[in-house]
Amino acid sequence: FFFNDTATTEIYTLSLHDALPICAPVEGIFDDADVVVKGRFVNQRVAGVPMEPNGIIAVPEPGGKLTAWIPSQAPHSVHGEFAGALGMDPADLRVRTAAVGGGFGSKAAFMVEFIIAAKAAQALDRPVKWTETRSENMVAMVQGRAQVQFVELGLKRDGTITALKEHVLGDAGAYPGTGSFLPFFTHTMATGVYNIPKLEFDWKAVLTNTTSIGAYRGAGRPEATQAIERILDMAADELGIDPVEIRRKNLLPKFEAPGMMAGSGLAMYDTGDYEAALDAALAHADYTALRAAQAERRASGATKQLGIGVSVYVEITAPAGMHVEYGAVEVLDDGSVKAYVGTSAHGQGHDTAFSMIVSEILGVPMDKVTLVQSDTALVPRGSGTMGSRSLQTGGSAVYRSSEGVLDKAKQLAAQLLEASPDDIVLGDGGLQVAGVPAKLVAWGELSAKAAGSGIEGLEAGLRHEIDFDGTQSSFPFGAHVAVVEIDTETGRVELVRHVAVDDCGRILNPMLVRGQQHGGIAQGVAQALYEWVQYDADGNPITANLMDYAMPSAAELPSFETYNTETPTHLNPLGAKGIGESGTIGSTPAVQNAVLDALSQFGIKNLDMPASSQRVWAAIQEARG
């Protein structure tokens, strides 16, 4: 059996466990509520569809060694599994990752085909290459979401939330892996940015005859935001309150230091100013004018009606187990710098971001900084790039390593220039005595001196490495406003505007942040309006290529309006939080809320995603009778 549509979501072959009451049942949970609003929400199964499918080039090396080129988000994690599967000494296996055509969480997994290709290469003593076809990728690569949520929200008549109760059914696919615990992340973020005094949450993961579920951009957090943001809109409708005002009434207050406990009790938020993000999004969207335009269309009975959707979110980045990252910085004899890091970029722009960090601290031009990553022979350890963790962990490791190099260089320069280390400052191409530019030692000279100088108290080499430990997760947040236009005669939905205000702490490079926002929003919109992995009555996949799987292109999407607020975290020296998944978390509920807002005049309360033309048209026809 399999999850395929809203009629069959309770059918499954095997439950992995009894429902887990992680938040113990609360006796009389809704006793003080005037109203209890109930909703059943489906987060349909979607595919990551990276531009580059999985593949490997396995190259035998002398002495029984092997080099494997793979498109991975976490080459060091794969390295350990790979060596174990091959029965090799890890020192004899080198895993390398070149430019990767997208990951989105799906390429954090280890593929069994890697073992087959490597074994073939060893047996033939020649390189072996394997690359998935698109159709193979659509059924073999782990997929995402696949949750059904049963949500109850208790409120006072004025819109104040009294309690939240959720039961989540998660489809893990055929083999229990990451998908079997993704509902835990949903639980962690269940109450979102709101003050919810009581929470009761339980979840169950089940096995189905389908492709396994794994991490997909957001991994459990978009599902949490979807549930709370949808039920809030339904509550606003029930109570006759504007969707913005019911949110504003229940937002957690601004806080600037860790200590704000999430309603789940599983997360300690670091910093947040949720109302500021909401206010900024409403201002940029001109919310009042949008409502006026909507009222005009409704009054005129226009065929094309406007819908306005709002969502406010908070998410967890660098989750537990992902706080530590390796970094090293080394100055070479020619004055150039190499930075080593255990993250593994696949489109995020780490070369630019991490070079900026080194350049800022050491005063070396960015074009003289080389980033070394994604190679287990050159970088001794690493946790990879996932969970929006890279800048706050890997970037901080590079930052601290750069500081270590600078401190060592100052001590060396002080001895060479016969000055106090406190008087040594950055100069043009090296270090100098403050106020005396003529007394300067170039970086190349410092490196050469450090290599074999034997100066008392300094180790040889101008290098510093560290395993940075962020100790806790950070919590980015934001607010999105979506505007859709629905043709009530055909059911066609067009996203005409999408405004996003995302807060990822202190921003290092605005252009890189914008890129992450745009990509994430596109994937979030795709889930709301287009994408859906489907199976036929016998469990055969019927969306196994891009002719059948409705992945939008730029032609279906507007130019997103992206902005930021900055609320730095205290958990790392950069003040940075993650940004890679924020777009998917904020956009999906905003777009779905916009669709339901447009359909509310027909009395339609809910509609499962994706809001395809067929579904919207059918809902309108049913409502019209």
Where do the language-model regions lie?
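Short, exposed "boundary/linker" segments that immediately precede the start
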Residues: 4-13
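Conserved phosphate/anionic-ligand binding catalytic regions in large, soluble enzymes, centered on
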Residues: 104, 108, 224, 350, ...
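Structural alpha/beta core scaffold segments of enzyme domains
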Residues: 1, 14-501, 557, 594-600, ...
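Contiguous domain-boundary segments centered on the initiation and propagation of an alpha-helix
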Residues: 295, 534-552, 556
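N-terminal amphipathic, basic-rich helices that act as targeting or association modules
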Residues: 1, 38-39, 247, 475, ...
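Amphipathic, heptad-repeat alpha-helical segments used for oligomerization and assembly
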Residues: 219, 389, 570-583
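Generic long, charged, amphipathic alpha-helical segments
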Residues: 370-373, 552-576
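Short, highly charged C-terminal tails/helix-capping segments
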Residues: 608-623
